[in-house]
A protein has these predicted regions:
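Acidic, serine/threonine- and glycine-rich low-complexity intrinsically disordered segments
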Residues: 163-324
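Hydrophobic/aromatic beta-strand positions that recur at structurally equivalent sites within the blades
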Residues: 61-68, 102-106, 151-153, 200-204, ...
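Repeated scaffold domains used in trafficking and secretory/extracellular systems
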Residues: 29-39, 76-90, 116-129, 161-176, ...
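Short beta-strand elements that form the blades of beta-propeller/WD-repeat-like
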Residues: 39-57, 82-102, 122-144, 170-192, ...
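Short, surface-exposed coil-to-beta transition loops
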Residues: 145-146, 195, 223, 324-327, ...
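Hydrophilic extracytoplasmic domains
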Residues: 18-23, 32-51, 104-105, 255-386
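Short coil/turn linkers that define WD40 beta-propeller blade boundaries
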Residues: 70-71, 108-110, 155-158, 205-207, ...
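N-terminal "mature head" segments of proteins
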Residues: 1-131, 143, 385
Length: 386
C-alpha cells in the first residue's frame, strides 16, 4: 500500500514537472516569436531592466517592454547587476552576463568573449551605427589595478579594450566617451585623506584611444550621483559631499576648454538626513534641457540650476508620494521627466513637464507584480522609447 502511495506521488510530481516545464518553455517561445515580429516595438513606450544582484548565482533578469496600454512584455535574460538599455530611434540594445541583444525588426543575440557581472554604461556609437558598452569588470587577475572593459563594433567587427581604472562617473557627446577616475592619498603625519580625480576621453575606431584631459583635487570624498552631460564645451554632473554637520548636493562643472573644475551647491541638508535625499536612480538623476541643469532627489523634489547665472532653485515636487528607499527609476527626454514606480502591488509610469511642473500622464502597468513576486529581481534602468 505504501509503495503504491509513494509511486502515485512520484508520478504526480513527474507529470507536474513536465507540465510546468512545458508551460515555461511555451511561454518563453511565444515571447521570442513576438519580439521577432517586425512591428513589436511599434506600440512600446518604455523598457525597464530588471536583474538579480551579483551575489545571486545563477543570475536572472528581465527586459520588460511596456506598451501604450500598460501591458508588460517580459523577456527573460541571465541578468546583469546595474544593467541598462539604449535606443537609437530604431533599435533597442540591452545585455546580460554573457550576451548582447539588439531588437528592431527582429531579435538578435550575440555572445561576448567572457562573462561580465556588473554593468556601467551603454551608449550609441554614431560612427558605426551601433552601440558600445562599458562594464565594471573588477580587479585585474594579477591583483594589480582595476579594470573596466569596453566593447564596441567597427566595420561590423567586435572590438574590446580595457580602461585601467574604476569609473566614478561617465558620459558621452557625439563620438567622445568621457570617464572620471579617482585616487586617494593619505598623509602619513595626520592621516588626512585627499582625493584626486582625472577626466579621460575615449574615442572608438579600429582601436580605442584614451587620453587624460584634466585633473583636479577635492578635500572631501564626493559621491557622484549621475552621468555626465555635455553643454557648450562643459561637462556637468551631480554629486554629494558630506562635511562635519551637513551634506551638500552639488552640480559639478568641468570646463573642457580651460581645464578647470568647479562646483555649485544646489541644496544642503543635515548630515543625518543625507540618505533620505539620495536619489533613487543609479545614474539618471540629472538632465540638461536648453540652458538648465535639472536634478531630482530621493524625496521627489526637482531642482534646476541656470547654467548662465549659476542660480539654483526648487522647481516642483512629485505628485505621487514615495519613500526614500522605494524603487523608483528615472528617465528624461527634452523637457519631460519620466518616473517608473516599481512595486509588488501596483506599478506605474508617470510623465512630468519640466516647464510647468505638472504631471501630464500616468500609465498604470499590468503584469510586473507577477515578475516581482516570483523572482528576486530589482529594477536598475528605465528607458523611454517614445
Amino acid at each position: 500500500m505504501n509503495k503504491r502511495y509513494f509511486m502515485i506521488i512520484a508520478i504526480t510530481i513527474v507529470i507536474s514537472s513536465v507540465i510546468a516545464y512545458y508551460y515555461l518553455v511555451h511561454t518563453e517561445s511565444i515571447r521570442e516569436k513576438e519580439m521577432d515580429e517586425t512591428d513589436f516595438l511599434k506600440d512600446k513606450v518604455a523598457v525597464v531592466y530588471y536583474s538579480t544582484t551579483i551575489d545571486t548565482r545563477p543570475g536572472k533578469g528581465f527586459a520588460v517592454f511596456i506598451d501604450q496600454n500598460g501591458e508588460a512584455y517580459p523577456f527573460e535574460t541571465k541578468g546583469l547587476e546595474l544593467g541598462s538599455s539604449a535606443f537609437n530611434g530604431k533599435t533597442v540594445f540591452f545585455q546580460d552576463e554573457t550576451n548582447d541583444y539588439t531588437l528592431s525588426t527582429e531579435l538578435k543575440k550575440e555572445k561576448r568573449d567572457k562573462p561580465q557581472f556588473t554593468g556601467d554604461y551603454i551608449g550609441e556609437n554614431p560612427k558605426d551605427n551601433s552601440f558600445f558598452s562599458i562594464f565594471n569588470t573588477g580587479f585585474a587577475e594579477n591583483g594589480e589595478g582595476y579594470e573596466s572593459d569596453i566593447y564596441w563594433k567597427h566595420n561590423q567587427q567586435h572590438k574590446k579594450d580595457t580602461l585601467p581604472f574604476f569609473i566614478e562617473t561617465r558620459g558621452q557627446h557625439k563620438n567622445n566617451i568621457y570617464t572620471i577616475s579617482g585616487d586617494v592619498t593619505t598623509d602619513e603625519k595626520d592621516g588626512h585623506e585627499s582625493y584626486t580625480f582625472a577626466l579621460h576621453k575615449t574615442t572608438l575606431s579600429a582601436e580605442a584611444k584614451t587620453v587624460e584631459i584634466m585633473s583636479w583635487n577635492d578635500s572631501d570624498e564626493p559621491l557622484p550621483l549621475s552621468h555626465m552631460h555635455y553643454f557648450n564645451n562643459h561637462l556637468y554632473y551631480l554629486d554629494t559631499v558630506s562635511r562635519k554637520e551637513k551634506s551638500e548636493f552639488r552640480m559639478v562643472d568641468l570646463d573642457l576648454k580651460n581645464k578647470q573644475a568647479d562646483d555649485q551647491i544646489i541644496f544642503e541638508t543635515a548630515l543625518e538626513e543625507t540618505d533620505d535625499f539620495l536619489p533613487h536612480s543609479v545614474h539618471k538623476n540629472a538632465h540638461i534641457d536648453k540652458d538648465k541643469f535639472y536634478m531630482i532627489d530621493g524625496k521627489g523634489n526637482v531642482y534646476s540650476t541656470d547654467l548662465r547665472t549659476g542660480s539654483s532653485k526648487k522647481e516642483f515636487h512629485i505628485k505621487t508620494e514615495f519613500q526614500p528607499h522605494d524603487f523608483v527609476e528615472v528617465d528624461w527626454r527634452d523637457h519631460y521627466l519620466y518616473l517608473y514606480f516599481n512595486t509588488t502591488d501596483k506599478s506605474a509610469l508617470e510623465t512630468y513637464d519640466l516647464t510647468s511642473g505638472e504631471r501630464i500622464d500616468r500609465l498604470e502597468i499590468k503584469g510586473v507584480e507577477e515578475i516581482l513576486k516570483k523572482n528576486k529581481v530589482y529594477s536598475y534602468d528605465l528607458l523611454i522609447l517614445k
